[in-house]
Amino acid sequence: MAMSSGGSGGGVPEQEDSVLFRRGTGQSDDSDIWDDTALIKAYDKAVASFKHALKNGDICETSGKPKTTPKRKPAKKNKSQKKNTAAPLKQWKVGDKCSAIWSEDGCIYPATIASVDFKRETCVVVYTGYGNREEQNLSDLLSPISEVANNIEQNAQENENESQVSTDESENSRSPGSKSDNIKSKSAPWNSFLPPPPPMPGPRLGPGKPGLKFNGPPPPPPPPPPHLLSCWMPPFPSGPPIIPPPPPICPDSLDDADALGSMLISWYMSGYHTGYYMGFRQNQKEGRCSHSLN
């Protein structure tokens, strides 16, 4: 009995000595592990030194810019000015097709160079289809109107394609079923919605003919811009040209832009046909007077 009790009593101290760590029995001195004060100070010091260096660098760059930029710009301008002044003298000659600005209305018309004065850098142009002559500066002459029109059409086509892609994407997200109808309505040219201009008078009553008192080449006015039409005119996929419809009756569905567009279009069409009728009657009267004198 004494040996068994002694053996059991001697085994307990061996088990207690084999325990290395027991949680919760004491306070561990590991609070310094989460102390990042030194790290924060080092970060703040690095950021402050970087900002200081960056500030000094900006001051040096801005102070050096004004010294270099003024020297480069005059050289580019002089080159472009030399090209512009030398091009008209070498480009234009008698018989060339060009476009010139009529001094009375400021519009561009196709013309042909009749004579050139290289000393004065001027020329005399004859407006195609009218016979009017006018002196122009060689530097003011423009490319033939066909080339200008082609460039304008290409730019307009590119802009229309870009706007069509953007509108198609937005409309597809709203109403996928109406995609074919929208494409058909957009493919039609915008100027087909306007009534066609009145036919020009016959060869006996045209402007620029002998016996008539037309001072300049008054062509029919161009149609209104497409953005003005789009704000008030509903799209028509097909059909013959029609008269612009009146504005809607309901005032709630009509905003200021739509009302202004409708008013301007009505004024434009009224003045267009009124001016044509008055000019046509004047041509008839002057034509009769010239025939009676002959």
UniProtKB/Swiss-Prot annotation:
Which GO molecular function annotations are given, in alphabetical order? Answer: RNA binding
Task: According to the UniProt record, list the residues that bear N-acetylalanine.
Answer: 2
Q: Where is this region: Required for interaction with RPP20/POP7?
A: 97-209
Residue spans of biased composition, Gly residues class: 1-12
Protein name (Swiss-Prot/TrEMBL): Survival motor neuron protein
Q: What family does the entry list? A: Belongs to the SMN family.
Q: Which UniProt keywords apply?
A: Acetylation, Cell projection, Cytoplasm, Isopeptide bond, mRNA processing, mRNA splicing, Neurogenesis, Nucleus, Phosphoprotein, RNA-binding, Ubl conjugation
